[in-house]
A protein has these predicted regions:
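Short helices/loops that flank or line small-molecule/ion binding pockets
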Residues: 150-160, 181-182, 283-292
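Short helix-initiation/N-cap motifs at beta->coil->alpha
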Residues: 90-92, 141-153, 276-285
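Solvent-exposed loop/turn segments at secondary-structure junctions
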Residues: 110-113, 130-133, 148, 162-172, ...
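Extracytoplasmic substrate-binding proteins
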Residues: 83-84, 94-96, 103, 173-252, ...
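A local structural motif
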Residues: 96-98, 135-142, 213, 267-277
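Bacterial Sec-exported substrate-binding components of ABC uptake systems
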Residues: 2-112, 211-244, 364-393
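A short, structured surface patch at a secondary-structure boundary
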Residues: 102-158, 162-170, 272
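His/Asp/Glu-enriched short active-site or ligand-binding loop at hydrolase and phosphoryl-transfer sites
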Residues: 128, 257-280, 300, 332-336
Length: 393
């Protein structure tokens, strides 16, 4: 073998070893335990992470075009020191979490998805009935129907290091106090765009998954900024008037201070309920007809999830309302029914993209929200997206 051939062989061997090492590093993850003692408060930053367009430590300026830059997920290799971490949850409570956290009960589906997306599903020892994704969590014991109605006895008996729930738990003071009196660390959060990024950030610290949390936050921030950058500068006279309705009650809408209102405004729409005094006002049919919305958004009722028939029947009921028959939204067919999961938790940017494309289709011709949804599910859960989430598609 001559020197030139030998040199080429050595180079090929070096490249093979380098590739193998990189793949091993990608696949090898540390134990899901907590990071060293530190104090972290959601009030420590000057801007609320839910303030769309604000820069966070994990946020990057969009690259040219629409290609989102991805990066490998690498975790800390240094063993953490198990002490404690203090966070401020959505109720304003200072919550001290003893570290390491080795067992969690989650009573909210969005928070369960965050924990699993961070690669810590093995820490879940219980869930509420609504926590049904990823499919593998269905093997976890059910410890209540919701955050409002947990099985206190079962949870206390299981002795979790941490319990996460949505604000419905704080409304049930008796149950909330029983759990805390039993010595269980309870974090109450809001599962929407106003708080989800904070939850991801501090759960990344608690679970020693800061790098994975950064990748997840980068995904959310990328698409959030994409929408913000494309709709900024649109004058109000070119923005569609939007009527958005809750699933629970006809004519109940979203006013200032609600996540639904924030979604509409961020996506480049004008909320017809923006001048109401309540966050969740009930509007009169006459008021909606007078505002003559260009787009109507209807949340799919929970009991109708899982089939196209539920979407179709919900839309048909809205189209048949006498007060709406003469509105531009009905006349142009811009009445959309959506599963609320698309704007909750880590799926929030998916809902934002759907809203933006419905409001300004000409600005988002190159964006397929369904494809983004599929990418998110594949990248962070390793499964394929199934089901129906919007109608018409």
């Amino acid at each position: 073998m001559d020197k030139r051939t030998l040199a080429i062989a050595i180079l090929i061997l070096a490249l093979a070893l380098s590739t193998t090492y990189a793949l091993l590093n990608w696949r090898t993850e540390p134990e899901c335990i907590s990071s060293p003692d530190q104090s972290w408060s959601s009030e420590s930053e000057s801007q609320n992470p839910g303030d769309l367009g604000s820069q966070t430590p994990n946020q990057e300026i969009l690259p040219e075009g629409n290609q989102r830059q991805t990066q490998p997920i690498e975790e800390q290799s240094k063993p953490p020191t198990p002490k404690n971490l203090t966070v401020v949850d959505s109720t304003g409570e200072n919550i001290t979490v003893n570290l390491p956290v080795r067992s969690i009960v989650s009573l909210n589906h969005g928070m369960t998805e965050v924990i699993c997306a961070l690669g810590c599903e093995q820490l879940l020892i219980g869930r509420s009935a609504s926590c049904n994704f990823p499919p593998s969590v269905l093997d976890k014991p059910v410890m209540g129907s919701s955050s409002y109605s947990p099985n206190v006895e079962l949870i206390v008996e299981s002795k979790p290091d941490l319990l996460v729930a949505d604000t419905m738990l704080s409304y049930n003071k008796e149950v909330y106090n029983k759990l805390r009196d039993a010595g269980i660390t309870v974090i109450v959060e809001i599962n929407n765009s106003t708080r989800i990024k904070k939850f991801i950030e501090y759960m990344g610290i608690i679970l020693n998954r800061t790098e994975r949390a950064k990748v997840l936050l980068d995904f959310i921030n990328y698409y959030e900024l994409l929408v913000v950058n494309r709709v900024k500068g649109i004058p109000d006279e070119l923005k569609p008037r939007v009527y958005s309705e809750w699933a629970a009650t006809a004519w109940r809408s979203y006013g200032p201070g609600s996540a639904g209102h924030l979604m509409i405004v961020t996506a480049g729409g004008l909320n017809i309920a923006s001048e109401t005094e309540k966050a969740y006002p009930t509007l009169s049919p006459e008021f909606v007809a007078e505002k003559n919305p260009d787009v109507i958004l209807i949340m799919l009722p929970g009991e109708l999830k899982g089939s196209i028939e539920g979407f179709v029947s919900t839309r048909d009921e809205v189209l048949a309302r006498p007060a709406l028959t003469g509105t531009r939204a009905v006349e142009t067919g811009k009445v959309y029914v959506y599963d609320p999961i698309i704007y909750q938790g880590i799926r929030y940017p998916v809902g934002l993209l759907y809203f933006a494309k419905w409001f300004h289709p000409e600005l988002f011709k190159d964006i397929d929200p369904g494809q983004v949804h599929s990418e998110l599910i594949r990248q962070f859960f390793g499964v394929s997206l199934e089901g129906i989430y919007v109608y018409p598609p």
